[in-house]
C-alpha cells in the first residue's frame, strides 16, 4: 500500500513511518503542505495522512486544494486538535476520517484499511468475537444478529477493545481514546462505562461474557468460552 504522509513534526513522522512500514506499507513523507499538494497531484497513493499544523500552510488548505484539483485519494487527518468543530471542518473540506493524536498503531492501521476498502468499494470492516459483531464503518454492534444500542462513549470503548482483541487495555488508554487528553475525568469513569457496556451486552448475550477484568491492569476483550457458547 502506498501512503503519502504530510507531517512537519519529525519525531511524530518517524513514529508513524515505523508503524506503517512494520505493516509493509510504502511511505512517502513531506513536512510541507505545498510539496504534499504537488505529490498528491502527481502520483497515485492509496491514502494520504495529513497533519493540520504545517509550517507553510494550513492542513485545511492542503485538503481543500487537493479536492478542488479533483484528487480523489482518500485523506485521513491526524491532528492534536480534538475539538468537534475541528473534526466537522476537516470532514466538511473532504477528509474521509479524522483521528486525534496520540493514537495506537492498531487503530491507525485498522482505520487506514477501512478507508481504503470504502474508497475501492469493498465490503464494510467487521470484527467478530464469538456472536459479537462490531461494524467499524457503520459503527453498529450486534450480538447473535440482535442490535445493541450503545452511547457514543460505550461504542468507542467497545471499538477499541475489538481493535485490540486479546490485549489488556489500561484505564489510561481508554481515557486517552475517549477524551484525547482534553478535560479528562477521573479514571473511575472507565469502570462505570465498562459496567454499563457489560450490562447491555449481557442483556442480549445471556451467559456469554466478552469483557474480562484483568485486576490491577485493565480490561480485555476475549472470545467467549467455546463450551459455554455451545450450551447457551
Swiss-Prot record:
GO terms for biological process: regulation of DNA-templated transcription. PROSITE patterns: OMPR_PHOB (PS51755), RESPONSE_REGULATORY (PS50110). Gene3D superfamilies: 3.40.50.2300, 6.10.250.690, Winged helix-like DNA-binding domain superfamily/Winged helix DNA-binding domain. The modification 4-aspartylphosphate is found at residue 51. Its main location: cytoplasm. One of its GO terms (molecular function) is transcription cis-regulatory region binding. It is found in: Cytoplasm. Residues 2-116 form the Response regulatory domain. It comes from the Bacteria. Keywords: Cytoplasm, DNA-binding, Phosphoprotein, Transcription, Transcription regulation, Two-component regulatory system. Residues 124-223 bind DNA. Coiled coil: none annotated. Pfam families: Response_reg (PF00072), Trans_reg_C (PF00486). One of its GO terms (cellular component) is cytosol. The keyword Transcription applies. Essential protein that plays a role in the control of cell division, possibly through the transcriptional regulation of ccrM, rpoD, pleC, minC and ftsZ genes. This is Cell cycle response regulator CtrA.
